[in-house]
Each structure stands twice: as C-alpha cells, then as structure tokens.
C-alpha cells in the first residue's frame, strides 16, 4: 500500500486510547439529558491509528448502554488503508463513512501523490468501490474537494458517479 508523504511525520502524533476515552467521557458527561450525541473520527488519517479507533468504538458501545445514550459515529478516510477487515468492522458497528476523493484521476493524483510521487487514485478508487459495495445499507458518501486546479468540478462529480459512487458531496 502506498502512503502519502506526510504520514511518517504524523505517526508520532497519533491519539492514544486514553485521550480518546477521556473525550468520550467528556462528551457523555457534558451532554446532559440529551440522548443523541455524535462522535467523528477525522483529521490526518484515522485508519493510521486503527487499533485506537477500534478500542474507542468498542468503548463507546459500552458507554452507550451504561448511560442510556445513542452515539452516532462517523469516520472520514482517504481510503488508502481501507481493507476488507476494516470495511466489515465499520459496517458491522454502524459507523457512517465520509470517503475522501479529490476528483478525477489527474486531479486526485496531483493533490495526493504517494510517498514516491506516484498516483494513489487507482488504489483508492478500488478500495472505495469495495467499501461502497459492502456497506449493507449503512450510511456513507464520497466527498470531493474542489480547488483552483479543478474549477470544472462538475466533471469530477460526474466521474465519481460513473465510478459507482451515487452519494457524492463537493466541498471547497
């Protein structure tokens, strides 16, 4: 699997389970009588810290029962590390997914080259297509980003739909 150039820089900055647990506890403690809460895994690439993501999801489920809460969880990923095991776990645990794809191939590869400058689009599209095909009705959408390099972003939206992603969002 190809890694983006910045991934080694951020490995030492990954959140520990202790910090994640305290964040969940804070959310529950400060949600008052509110039954429904939300927790989002995003920033950097959450799947680089997969073990902590799993621990946190398991902890949230235990705390939901203990405190009578319903916590909707979502995870934003670039899809590079999204494999069958992760898709199954996230789907089985009802985690909403925001799948990030920076437009069509030439746009995406320009914005997100691999560690050696190679394109990542083909591998990511393959991973996202597998994910979407195996969501079993669980929520997801593919989020594209438009920049000064793809002001014709409608072309990117059409490309995403043509790749089998009917749930698409575009963001600046």
Residue ranges with predicted function:
Residues 17-20, 24-40, 49-172:
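Radical SAM/AdoMet-radical enzyme domain recognition
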Residues 1-8:
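Single conserved hydrophobic/aromatic residue that forms the stacking wall/gate
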């Amino acid at each position: 699997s190809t890694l983006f150039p910045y991934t080694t820089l951020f490995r030492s900055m990954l959140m520990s389970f202790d910090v994640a647990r305290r964040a969940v506890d804070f959310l529950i403690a400060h949600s008052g009588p509110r039954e429904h809460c939300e927790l989002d895994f995003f920033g950097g690439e959450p799947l680089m810290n997969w073990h902590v993501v799993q621990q946190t999801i398991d902890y949230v489920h235990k705390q939901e029962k203990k405190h009578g809460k319903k916590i909707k969880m979502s995870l934003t990923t670039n899809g590079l590390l999204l494999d069958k095991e992760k898709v199954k776990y996230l789907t089985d645990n009802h985690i909403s997914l925001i799948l990030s794809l920076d437009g069509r191939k030439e746009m995406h590869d320009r914005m997100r080259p691999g560690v050696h400058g190679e394109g990542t689009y083909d591998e990511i599209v393959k991973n996202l297509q597998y994910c979407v095909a195996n969501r079993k009705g669980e929520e997801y959408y593919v989020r594209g980003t438009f920049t000064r390099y793809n002001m014709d972003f409608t072309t990117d939206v059409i490309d995403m739909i043509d790749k089998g992603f009917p749930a698409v969002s575009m963001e600046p």
